[in-house]
Amino acid sequence: MAMKIDILTLFPEMFDIFNHSIIGRAIDKGILKIQSHNIRDYSMNKHKKVDDYPYGGGAGMVMTPQPIVDSIKDLKINNKGKVIFLGPRGKTFNQEIAKTLSKEKELIFICGHYEGIDERVYKYIDEEISLGDFVLTGGEMACIPVVDSICRLVPGVLSSSESYMEESFYNGLLEYPQYTRPECFEGENVPKVLLSGHHDNIRKWRRYKSLTITKTRRPDLFKQITLSKEDKKLLEIYSKE
């Protein structure tokens, strides 16, 4: 059965991006089903208006509750999944959240706009997710990478589970360096260990590189890692070379 994702947005055409590349192929194979729905279609306003001035004054406009709530209720008829709002007050999205959500069978995402949504909509929302401490033009900009990162973890989307298990963040570390042909480029050679054909040595080298890159570039992540005996030994051995 396909993982079903419904996206509520004012700009459904932005999600045509999912019809291409890896996600597009997964949709064609029936592994994923992603549909975007225009919130404006649910507006009872004769001009299909979906925003209004905030009570109490202030800059900008706020999305009105009626179209959003009605669209959620409509989708809930055939989608019993969590309702997730992309907003700045949510918990920061990361790989662990992606892994958790990739196990769901159905999900509904809401993309906000303007100065946000009417507070009374939140009782219909199960979870709020943020990409980080910065402001985007609209929730669509956040929804695309969130949905992409979730979908690629769904079994069958990638050709092999190893494709994502060795990527940055999946195991709490940043990814090791990658090399391809030519063997020498602008005087810089591919590390000899990668040409050796010795799989265990290659594994150890990659693990060491992941550890050192994470320690240097993301010390906050490195502090959360419980180093194994092998990790400690690798750091000791390679640091002497």
From Swiss-Prot:
Primary role: Specifically methylates guanosine-37 in various tRNAs.
Assembly and binders: Homodimer.
GO CC field: cytosol
Pfam family, one: tRNA_m1G_MT
Coiled-coil blocks: none
GO MF annotations, alphabetized: tRNA (guanine(37)-N1)-methyltransferase activity
Stated name of the protein: tRNA (guanine-N(1)-)-methyltransferase
EC top class, as a word: transferase
Gene3D superfamilies named among the record's database cross-references: 3.40.1280.10, tRNA(m1g37)methyltransferase, domain 2
Lineage of the organism: Bacteria, Bacillati, Bacillota, Clostridia, Eubacteriales
The EC number(s) this enzyme carries: 2.1.1.228
Entry keywords, A to Z: Cytoplasm, Methyltransferase, S-adenosyl-L-methionine, Transferase, tRNA processing
PANTHER family with a match to the protein in the record: TRNA (GUANINE-N(1)-)-METHYLTRANSFERASE
Origin species: Clostridium novyi (strain NT)
InterPro entries: Alpha/beta_knot_MTases, tRNA_m1G_MeTrfase_C_sf, tRNA_m1G_MeTrfase_TrmD, tRNA_m1G_MTases_N, tRNA_MeTrfase_TRMD/TRM10
Major location category of this protein: cytoplasm
Chain sites annotated for binding S-adenosyl-L-methionine: G112, L131, G132, D133, F134, V135, L136
Family: Belongs to the RNA methyltransferase TrmD family.
Protein location: Cytoplasm
Recorded catalytic activity of this chain's protein: guanosine(37) in tRNA + S-adenosyl-L-methionine = N(1)-methylguanosine(37) in tRNA + S-adenosyl-L-homocysteine + H(+)
Gene Ontology BP annotations: tRNA N1-guanine methylation
NCBIfam families named among the record's database cross-references: PRK00026.1, trmD
Keyword Transferase: yes
